[in-house]
């Protein structure tokens, strides 16, 4: 088990987590439970779809737990204007963070100028309203060169985070991808790992590889595992 098991506290580990509920079948009760769990465990953020932002904003107001909206999710196949509108509306409704999916078609077509315009537009709407911007690559569909190209665009534009995955693609976060992204962006941009992170060991490995945020729907389970091991 990682050395982090002994250096992290319950509180510091909890702050890595964006506690996630993005299922199309999620009920209002599910969203309320997500917020309640995040308050109880002091997670950094709840990750939800834009339609859930007003409810989460009301439930979490003044708590310090951020509300994060997923934009262009999960396919990224929206126009720049649609993504900007969704991000702006989500922020107006109370979101403090935006996780948006890139246009993967543009990347596969090597239309880097489009991707830079898209990223700049999303970063701008977030900056204007004081929100954090995270860029989801969806690495399971990308080659190494494509991942590196997106990191270079991010370095030019300056979002707050680059993120591995939606959790809805054919694969989630991998240690190799987190390491690649961290090598490319260094300390200038943070890395978020998401997708398939369901155990404490997996989460700690992602943190050791360079992730500064973890997106997971298993955050409560992971934190509970940490607490049990620290007591043994």
Specify the residue positions occupied by each region the protein language model found.
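Alpha/beta enzyme core
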Residues: 2-41, 45, 53-58, 62-73, ...
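Short hydrophobic "strand-cap" motifs at the C-terminus of beta-strands
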Residues: 194
């Amino acid at each position: 088990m990682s050395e982090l098991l002994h250096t992290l506290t319950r509180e510091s580990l909890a702050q890595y987590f964006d506690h996630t509920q993005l299922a199309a079948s999620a009920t209002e009760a599910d969203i309320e439970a997500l917020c309640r769990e995040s308050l109880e465990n002091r997670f950094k953020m709840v990750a939800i779809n834009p339609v859930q932002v007003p409810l989460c904003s009301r439930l979490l107001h003044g708590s310090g737990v951020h509300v994060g909206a997923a934009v262009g999710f999960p396919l990224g196949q929206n126009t720049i204007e649609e993504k900007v509108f969704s991000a702006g509306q989500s922020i107006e409704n109370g979101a403090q963070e935006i996780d948006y999916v890139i246009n993967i078609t543009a990347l596969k077509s090597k239309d880097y100028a489009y991707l830079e315009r898209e990223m700049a537009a999303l970063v701008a709407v977030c900056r204007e309203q004081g929100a954090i911007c995270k860029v989801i690559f969806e690495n399971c569909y990308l080659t190494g060169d494509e991942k590196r190209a997106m990191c270079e665009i991010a370095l030019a534009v300056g979002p707050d985070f680059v993120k591995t995955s939606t959790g809805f693609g054919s694969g989630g976060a991998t240690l190799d991808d987190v390491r690649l992204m961290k090598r490319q962006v260094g300390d200038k941009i943070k890395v978020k790992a998401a997708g398939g992170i369901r155990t404490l060991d997996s989460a700690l490995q992602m943190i050791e590889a360079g992730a500064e945020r973890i997106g997971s729907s298993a955050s409560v389970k992971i934190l509970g595992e940490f607490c049990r091991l620290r007591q043994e």
